[in-house]
């Protein structure tokens, strides 16, 4: 970080909206945030207590739930503060740096994790007899660890490139969170080279993972079509459909914001809300409503709680 950085704080401009919508938006985002945290905590609890869910797929799902819970926590509380407190828009320089780092750290890790999960589904469906020998506990741990390390490296690049520049004013960030593109507009130096590097790195990570995921699912579909029983086909399609829905909702808005030419604040703001506020909620919703094993485990947990309370 340069010594020429004179700013000690930034002001988040928040979402572009009419002031009369402050209270309704606060209520909606608060409800979504609480549901996101509770929903993902519930998935973690159910998988933890039900031994039938101690499988590779659910091991990666616990990582995903943990990421989504904290991904939402990094952005939504500050967004809520900007809606109800005049002073809530202010964020210190170092807090802004931390928010950018963890935003990209968790987002990048989730991106890599989706790639790993697609490989896991491919191996499970295409090589069912060899699957357990290939996806051992050690292999799963190494894969999960690699996603977290890759996300950390990706985020460190974003943070270092963004905050080594001098910032001497103005300090109004045209966003509701600290992200590289709006922050770079405030730098007191030429940012064209850094913007290009960030664009390329985000593009390689997001587009690369997405393309590899698509290729995995093309191979999965080909493998499913070779399954002889209709019940086997239906179960395989159902399992993969849940993952595909979450993947599309995660990558779609992200690619739209970072890789499209030009920028419109209102459109970017709405898409960013979907990406940072609503997408983390989709994980518990999709994986509980569409997954029979998780629903069965939830019912068992409910019965256990009811039985313990009746004693």
From Swiss-Prot:
<keyword id="KW-0675">Receptor</keyword>
<feature type="topological domain" description="Cytoplasmic">
    <location>
        <begin position="290"/>
        <end position="311"/>
    </location>
</feature>
<feature type="topological domain" description="Extracellular">
    <location>
        <begin position="1"/>
        <end position="23"/>
    </location>
</feature>
<feature type="topological domain" description="Extracellular">
    <location>
        <begin position="74"/>
        <end position="98"/>
    </location>
</feature>
<feature type="transmembrane region" description="Helical; Name=2">
    <location>
        <begin position="53"/>
        <end position="73"/>
    </location>
</feature>
<feature type="topological domain" description="Cytoplasmic">
    <location>
        <begin position="120"/>
        <end position="138"/>
    </location>
</feature>
<feature type="topological domain" description="Cytoplasmic">
    <location>
        <begin position="217"/>
        <end position="236"/>
    </location>
</feature>
<feature type="transmembrane region" description="Helical; Name=7">
    <location>
        <begin position="269"/>
        <end position="289"/>
    </location>
</feature>
<keyword id="KW-1133">Transmembrane helix</keyword>
<feature type="topological domain" description="Extracellular">
    <location>
        <begin position="160"/>
        <end position="196"/>
    </location>
</feature>
<feature type="topological domain" description="Cytoplasmic">
    <location>
        <begin position="45"/>
        <end position="52"/>
    </location>
</feature>
<keyword id="KW-0472">Membrane</keyword>
<protein>
    <recommendedName>
        <fullName>Olfactory receptor 10G8</fullName>
    </recommendedName>
</protein>
<dbReference type="GO" id="GO:0004984">
    <property type="term" value="F:olfactory receptor activity"/>
</dbReference>
<dbReference type="Pfam" id="PF13853">
    <property type="entry name" value="7tm_4"/>
</dbReference>
<dbReference type="InterPro" id="IPR000725">
    <property type="entry name" value="Olfact_rcpt"/>
</dbReference>
<comment type="similarity">
    <text>Belongs to the G-protein coupled receptor 1 family.</text>
</comment>
<feature type="transmembrane region" description="Helical; Name=6">
    <location>
        <begin position="237"/>
        <end position="257"/>
    </location>
</feature>
<feature type="transmembrane region" description="Helical; Name=1">
    <location>
        <begin position="24"/>
        <end position="44"/>
    </location>
</feature>
<keyword id="KW-0716">Sensory transduction</keyword>
<feature type="disulfide bond">
    <location>
        <begin position="96"/>
        <end position="188"/>
    </location>
</feature>
<keyword id="KW-0325">Glycoprotein</keyword>
<keyword id="KW-0812">Transmembrane</keyword>
<feature type="transmembrane region" description="Helical; Name=5">
    <location>
        <begin position="197"/>
        <end position="216"/>
    </location>
</feature>
<keyword id="KW-0552">Olfaction</keyword>
<dbReference type="GO" id="GO:0004930">
    <property type="term" value="F:G protein-coupled receptor activity"/>
</dbReference>
<keyword id="KW-1003">Cell membrane</keyword>
<feature type="glycosylation site" description="N-linked (GlcNAc...) asparagine">
    <location>
        <position position="3"/>
    </location>
</feature>
<keyword id="KW-1015">Disulfide bond</keyword>
<dbReference type="InterPro" id="IPR017452">
    <property type="entry name" value="GPCR_Rhodpsn_7TM"/>
</dbReference>
<dbReference type="InterPro" id="IPR000276">
    <property type="entry name" value="GPCR_Rhodpsn"/>
</dbReference>
<dbReference type="GO" id="GO:0005886">
    <property type="term" value="C:plasma membrane"/>
</dbReference>
<keyword id="KW-0297">G-protein coupled receptor</keyword>
<feature type="transmembrane region" description="Helical; Name=4">
    <location>
        <begin position="139"/>
        <end position="159"/>
    </location>
</feature>
<keyword id="KW-0807">Transducer</keyword>
<feature type="transmembrane region" description="Helical; Name=3">
    <location>
        <begin position="99"/>
        <end position="119"/>
    </location>
</feature>
<comment type="function">
    <text>Odorant receptor.</text>
</comment>
<feature type="topological domain" description="Extracellular">
    <location>
        <begin position="258"/>
        <end position="268"/>
    </location>
</feature>
<dbReference type="GO" id="GO:0050911">
    <property type="term" value="P:detection of chemical stimulus involved in sensory perception of smell"/>
</dbReference>
């Amino acid at each position: 970080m340069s010594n020429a950085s004179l700013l000690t704080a930034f002001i988040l401009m928040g979402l572009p909206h009419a002031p009369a919508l402050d209270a309704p938006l606060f209520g909606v985002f608060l409800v979504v945030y609480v549901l996101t945290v509770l929903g993902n905590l519930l998935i973690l609890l159910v998988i933890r207590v039900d031994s039938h869910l101690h499988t590779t797929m659910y091991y990666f799902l616990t990582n995903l739930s943990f990421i989504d819970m904290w991904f939402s926590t990094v952005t939504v509380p500050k967004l809520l503060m900007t809606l109800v407190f005049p002073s809530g828009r202010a964020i210190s320089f170092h807090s802004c740096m931390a928010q950018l780092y963890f935003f990209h750290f968790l987002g990048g890790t989730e991106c890599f994790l989706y790639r790993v999960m697609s490989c896991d589904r491919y191996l499970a469906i295409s090589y069912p007899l060899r699957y357990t020998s290939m996806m051992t506990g050690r292999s799963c741990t190494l894969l999960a660890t690699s996603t977290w390390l890759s996300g950390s490296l990706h985020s460190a690049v974003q943070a270092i490139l963004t905050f080594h520049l001098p910032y001497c004013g103005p300090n109004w960030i045209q966003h509701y969170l600290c992200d590289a593109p709006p922050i770079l507009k405030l730098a007191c130096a030429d940012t064209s080279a850094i913007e290009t590097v960030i664009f390329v790195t985000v593009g390689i990570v997001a587009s690369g993972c997405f393309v590899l995921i698509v290729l995995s699912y093309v191979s999965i579909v080909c493998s499913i079509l070779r399954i002889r029983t209709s019940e086997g086909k239906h179960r395989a399609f159902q399992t993969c459909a849940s993952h595909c829905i979450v993947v599309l909702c995660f990558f779609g808005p992200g690619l739209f914001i970072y890789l499209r030419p030009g920028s419109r604040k209102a459109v970017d703001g709405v898409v960013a809300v979907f990406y940072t506020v609503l997408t983390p909620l989709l994980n518990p919703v999709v994986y509980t409503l569409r997954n029979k094993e998780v629903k069965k485990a939830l019912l068992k947990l409910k019965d256990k709680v009811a039985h313990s309370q009746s004693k």
